[in-house]
């Protein structure tokens, strides 16, 4: 299932690397949120054929801001300088959204993480995207 999802993502029409870098970090995070959510939901459904309420609860463990923030902090040293810059830009971007039920710092790190995923996806760096997604899941499951 995971392999077919990555194949689906790889077949989308993408921007040039320069075009991706010109996007706002919040736009990258917007895309990254969708990519991460689809990845996690696909992974959970492939593992467990359960009622939707159960699937939702399992998904939240991975996609909540606190989990994403912890994940990006733990893998930060494994990122390239360019990837670290994307995370920093996303983390430092001011948003009009007020985080609910999470500290502002965790929310900002989660935004940085999602910006990185959006960047990798739109830049067509699918192997690296898959690597980061897998590392993130490992960190959260520890």
Swiss-Prot record:
Record EC number: 3.1.26.-
Top EC group: hydrolase
Lineage, uppermost ranks: Bacteria, Bacillati, Bacillota, Clostridia, Thermoanaerobacterales
Entries under InterPro entries matching the protein: Mini3_fam (IPR008226), RNase_III_dom (IPR000999), RNase_III_sf (IPR036389)
Active site residues of this protein: 33
Gene3D superfamilies noted in UniProt: Ribonuclease III domain
Any single GO CC term annotated in Swiss-Prot or TrEMBL for this entry: cytoplasm
Its job: Involved in correct processing of both the 5' and 3' ends of 23S rRNA precursor. Processes 30S rRNA precursor transcript even in absence of ribonuclease 3 (Rnc); Rnc processes 30S rRNA into smaller rRNA precursors.
Source domain of life: Bacteria
Keywords for this protein: Cytoplasm, Endonuclease, Hydrolase, Magnesium, Nuclease, Ribosome biogenesis, RNA-binding, rRNA processing, rRNA-binding
Gene, per the UniProt record: mrnC
Pfam families: Ribonuclease_3 (PF00636)
Record GO biological process: rRNA processing
GO molecular function (one): rRNA binding
Keyword Ubl conjugation: no
Protein name: Mini-ribonuclease 3
